[in-house]
């Protein structure tokens, strides 16, 4: 019987070729990621509870200061100072400090994550490494500390849900709509402790694929792996990692992208997804473009294509927080950033921004936000009384122009709503 991507990668990491779903395996990890919010507790666990003096391999550890970057409080500044000193003391090779961006895209940009690798991180959206066809999985403090000490961890090999795409997107529709469609179809628990394989999106860049990989955790997945076809020479695929026709899947679903309409996740659950046409006229206060799910160059460019020559609607704030400095520099070099600024958007430091509700644009009670991120739970971006609608960068930009949740086509096909600079 053939193997899924999860079975192949976990088999390779465990030194076994016969791995199947349900097996228990001890695996060697290729990279451990830890970020600023959990690093202090991980460091304490590593040294005080496990008794380890040093990490097992300083070249296979990446520390990223991205969750509250720059620090918003003295306590956060002290914690980040502690992390920097620890990194220097350990001789760790890879520290990505304030302004470099979010761990998931940054580690792929740096070439630290490649197809077939096994990566564990102290963040639930570590499934994002599947954008580069790696097995990425989030873990808690103790498991990350153990991986730092030994270079190993264990998994029950997950079953796999296969999500197929056919066709291509119509104007105004993009990969975020596909990801939200999958959340709507599979539901929040539809892939609990399973791997999600994404197929049929070879035309997407790895950054666009990250939308799918990061949304995998929102259906309960242990990992979300996008088929590596089309990744390019900078992401060489090992010969042993391949699609096997006779692999066994727990479920297979298919989406015709050519008929897909814009999707919106309405408060307060990610899988509470409806067609945009069914949302009604919802006025918004804030449009927030960012996160590891949709804060990349491609997302900023998509928004800029709608905002070009237009201004934000009165009483709408638009905050753009790039996912990485690389995406920010690219947007600055080709005029994308200038277009966003001309429209009235505010640009933040690359990083997680308000995604965890701790700084850089948190919401007040009763405020309505269209967010290109991945979660819309109560209190996710600040006040529990705020309402968060998840949508694509295209929908976000169109909404910023009109002041209410809007199909991109309504702005692109009409000059009436445009206010030219």
From Swiss-Prot:
Chain positions recorded as [4Fe-4S] cluster binding sites: 292, 352, 355
Recorded superkingdom: Bacteria
Keywords: 4Fe-4S, Amino-acid biosynthesis, Branched-chain amino acid biosynthesis, Iron, Iron-sulfur, Leucine biosynthesis, Lyase, Metal-binding
SUPFAM superfamilies in alphabetical order: Aconitase iron-sulfur domain
Classification via InterPro entries: Acnase/IPM_dHydase_lsu_aba_1/3 (IPR015931), Acoase/IPM_deHydtase_lsu_aba (IPR001030), Aconitase_4Fe-4S_BS (IPR018136), Aconitase_4Fe-4S_dom (IPR036008), HAcnase/IPMdehydase_lsu_prok (IPR011826), Homoacnase/IPMdehydase_lsu (IPR006251), IPM_dehydratase_rel_enz (IPR050067)
EC number in record: 4.2.1.33
Catalytic activity reported: (2R,3S)-3-isopropylmalate = (2S)-2-isopropylmalate
Pathway(s) where this gene product acts: Amino-acid biosynthesis; L-leucine biosynthesis; L-leucine from 3-methyl-2-oxobutanoate: step 2/4
Gene Ontology molecular function: 3-isopropylmalate dehydratase activity; 4 iron, 4 sulfur cluster binding; metal ion binding
Cofactor binding, per record: Binds 1 [4Fe-4S] cluster per subunit.
Pfam family, one: Aconitase
Cofactor (UniProt): [4Fe-4S] cluster
Biological processes annotated in GO: L-leucine biosynthetic process
Assembly notes: Heterodimer of LeuC and LeuD.
Family to which this protein belongs: Belongs to the aconitase/IPM isomerase family. LeuC type 2 subfamily.
Function: Catalyzes the isomerization between 2-isopropylmalate and 3-isopropylmalate, via the formation of 2-isopropylmaleate.
Protein name: 3-isopropylmalate dehydratase large subunit
Gene: leuC
């Amino acid at each position: 019987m053939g193997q899924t991507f999860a079975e192949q990668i976990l088999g390779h990491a465990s030194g076994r070729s016969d791995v199947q779903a349900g097996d228990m395996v001890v695996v060697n990890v290729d990279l451990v990621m830890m970020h600023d919010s959990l690093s202090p507790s991980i460091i304490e666990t590593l040294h005080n509870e496990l008794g380890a003096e040093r990490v097992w391999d300083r070249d296979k550890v990446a520390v990223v200061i991205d969750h509250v970057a720059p620090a918003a409080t003295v306590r956060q500044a002290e914690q980040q100072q502690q992390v920097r000193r620890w990194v220097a003391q350990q001789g760790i090779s890879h520290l990505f400090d304030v302004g470099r961006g979010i761990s998931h895209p940054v580690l792929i940009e740096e070439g630290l994550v490649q197809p077939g690798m096994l990566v564990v991180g102290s963040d639930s959206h570590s499934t994002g490494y599947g954008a580069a066809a790696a097995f990425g999985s989030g873990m808690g403090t103790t498991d990350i500390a153990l991986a730092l000490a030994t270079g190993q961890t264990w998994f029950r090999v997950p079953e796999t849900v296969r999500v197929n795409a056919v066709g291509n997107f119509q104007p105004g529709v993009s990969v975020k709509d596909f990801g939200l469609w999958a959340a709507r179809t599979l539901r929040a628990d539809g892939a609990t402790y399973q791997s999600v394989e994404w197929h049929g999106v070879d035309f997407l860049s790895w950054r666009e694929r990250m939308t799918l990989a990061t949304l995998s955790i929102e259906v309960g997945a242990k990992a979300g792996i996008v088929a590596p076809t089309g990744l390019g020479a900078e992401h060489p695929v090992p010969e042993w990692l391949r699609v096997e026709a006779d692999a066994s899947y727990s479920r297979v679903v298919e989406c015709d992208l050519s008929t897909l309409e814009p999707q919106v996740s309405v408060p307060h659950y990610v899988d509470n997804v409806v067609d945009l046409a069914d949302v009604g006229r919802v006025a918004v206060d804030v449009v927030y473009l960012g996160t590891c799910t949709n804060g990349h160059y491609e997302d900023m460019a998509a928004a800029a294509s709608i905002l070009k020559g237009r201004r934000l609607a009165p009483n709408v704030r638009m905050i753009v927080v790039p996912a990485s400095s690389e995406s920010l520099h690219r947007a600055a070099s080709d005029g994308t950033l200038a277009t966003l600024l001309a429209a009235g958007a505010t640009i933040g430091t690359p990083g997680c921004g308000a995604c965890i509700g701790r700084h850089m644009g948190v919401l007040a009670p009763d405020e309505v936000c269209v967010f290109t991120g991945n979660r819309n739970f109560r209190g996710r971006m600040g006040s529990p009384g705020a309402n968060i609608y998840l949508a694509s960068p295209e929908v976000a930009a169109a909404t910023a122009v009109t002041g209410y949740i809007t199909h991109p086509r309504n702005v692109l096909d009409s000059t009436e709503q445009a206010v030219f600079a």
